Amino acid sequence: MKFRGSAAGICVTCAIAFVGGCANRVAPPMKGITVAAGYGAVQPFSLARPGEAMPVGWEAWNLSRFIASTRYGIVEHEGERVLMANADISASGLLQPLKLVPSEYPFITWRWKVPQLIPGADNASGVGDDSPVRVIVAFDGDKSKLDFEDHAVARTVKLFSGREMPYATIQYIWENKLPPETVLEHARTGRSKMLVVESGPARLNQWLTFKRDVRADYQRMYGEPAGPIIFVGVMTDSNSTGTKTSAYYGDIRFSREE
């Protein structure tokens, strides 16, 4: 995702901030997971109806009126109901507000399938920072600990979006060349970081399942314990490279046990 110009340059963080005011909303529990009272779980795509553009519990996550939105919808694919994303020089996502304590639900599991890589995509360069798939987790925290630059970004986000910027986010991405476990930082703020979990073409066109300990990933990336999880999101973007891409997302869930 790349945004040009002084106003457009904060669109990613503005998009993340969009859900800052939604943190207190609790989604119904996901089938098959026992969730403590007062906590939410991720609504599964597999229980949505084919043709639905907005699965129950999920919200559109548009970055800017100047940027085309990626199209999402529930489809039947290989005998399963999954979320399909189609990006055409576009960038947007879907998100679900949550209220989860990482120490109680430390593990996130998801599935995705990518038909092809995005030519020219390079999330390290800041020029072609697109990814066919992203799973994004946002966290609350003590914003008084943010440095001057991050406070300035937060104020700008508040000005442009009317929403508070989350304390921190992790984006799990598929990269063209960088090896798995590579950590990348957002160009404008240290409070949004990417973690490469898949790279290169070797496992294209197949369903891949990932399970991550968000506590461990957060500790490694931010050097402190993770605060409450306030939303989970998915995003497929191709606007930086001016290309088209598609991808499939299976159910996402948080769980207690490894």
Report each predicted region and the residues it spans.
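C-terminal motif of bacterial Sec signal peptides marking the signal peptidase cleavage site
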Residues: 18-21
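Extracellular carbohydrate-recognition regions
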Residues: 23-64, 148-155
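Extracellular beta-strand ligand-recognition surfaces/modules
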Residues: 26-30, 133-135, 190-200, 204-242
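Extracellular beta-strand elements of beta-rich domains used
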Residues: 45, 232, 252-254
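Short carbohydrate-recognition loop motifs
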Residues: 70-92
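Extracellular/lumenal carbohydrate-interaction signature centered on repeated Trp-anchored short motifs
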Residues: 97-108, 201-204
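Extracellular-facing segments of soluble proteins and assemblies that are Gly/Ser/Thr-biased and enriched
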Residues: 104-154, 158
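Extracellular/luminal beta-rich ligand-recognition
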Residues: 130, 140-188
